């Protein structure tokens, strides 16, 4: 998909992919095919390498951090571990980290998740059990990621001369914890007003 996106001239690629642990036939964890803590190095998995390659070609790759924060795995998945991937964690409407939002690895220089966006109590449209249109709430970093990708697209429209890497850096620099990132919130919540100023100065 990333190769096709590149061939079509896509500038921003948003995904909710997150590969971590796989089940065996009995419902347990298949240790042979599952990823380990050591594999979260940003270089091991093919999906992460592919996402980083897309970023190297000038695509802003935005990926949900994952919803494993409250289970036994608890860390981001692949390709969110890529150093060129903008991994997005989830907050609630009060700007508190959502309990399900996955944690970063924290054992090297990569800040993961990179930033946070609302992923709890997100208004979404859909169908009810009778097939009628409805609006309701939903949860997940799969909602945080496209919110960030959409805002990034607006920034890029404001200054089309930015590179994907510059845009990623501006989003991080505008965030609430830029000077003290951690493995829970990354650089924090972006201030897209501030990001706009940085993008257009």
Question: What are the residue ranges of the model-derived segments?
Answer:
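Substrate-binding/access-modulating region of protease and related hydrolase catalytic domains
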Residues: 1-81, 107-110, 129-145, 183-184
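Solvent-exposed, polar/charged alpha-helical surfaces in well-ordered, non-transmembrane soluble domains
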Residues: 3, 7, 49-56, 86, ...
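C-terminal subdomain of the subtilisin-like protease fold in secreted/lumenal serine endopeptidases
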Residues: 10-14, 157-201
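Solvent-exposed loop/turn segments at secondary-structure junctions
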Residues: 18-23, 67-71, 91-95, 106-107, ...
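Active-site-proximal flexible loops/turns
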Residues: 23-25, 73, 121, 149, ...
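N-terminal domain-start motif of subtilase-like serine proteases
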Residues: 46, 52-53, 95-101, 190-193
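Extracellular S/T/G-rich loop segment that most often corresponds to the catalytic His/Ser-adjacent loop
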Residues: 80-157, 161
């Amino acid at each position: 998909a990333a190769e096709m996106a590149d061939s079509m001239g896509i500038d921003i690629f948003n995904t909710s992919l997150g590969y971590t642990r796989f089940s065996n036939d009995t419902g347990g964890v298949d240790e042979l095919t599952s990823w380990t803590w050591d594999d979260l190095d940003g270089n091991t998995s093919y999906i992460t390498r592919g996402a980083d390659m897309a970023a190297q070609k000038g695509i802003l790759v935005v990926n949900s951090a994952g919803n494993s924060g409250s289970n036994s795995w608890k860390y981001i998945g692949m390709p969110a571990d890529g150093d060129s991937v903008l991994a997005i964690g989830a907050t609630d409407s009060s700007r508190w980290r959502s309990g399900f939002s996955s944690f970063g690895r924290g054992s090297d220089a990569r800040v993961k998740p990179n930033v946070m966006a609302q992923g709890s109590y997100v208004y979404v449209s859909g169908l009810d059990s009778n097939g009628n249109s409805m609006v309701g709430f939903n949860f997940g970093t799969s909602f945080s990621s496209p919110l960030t990708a959409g805002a990034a697209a607006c920034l890029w429209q404001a200054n089309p001369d930015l590179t994907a890497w510059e845009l990623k850096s501006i989003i991080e620099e505008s965030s609430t914890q830029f000077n003290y990132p951690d493995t829970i919130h990354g650089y924090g919540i972006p201030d897209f007003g501030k990001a706009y100023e940085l993008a257009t100065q």
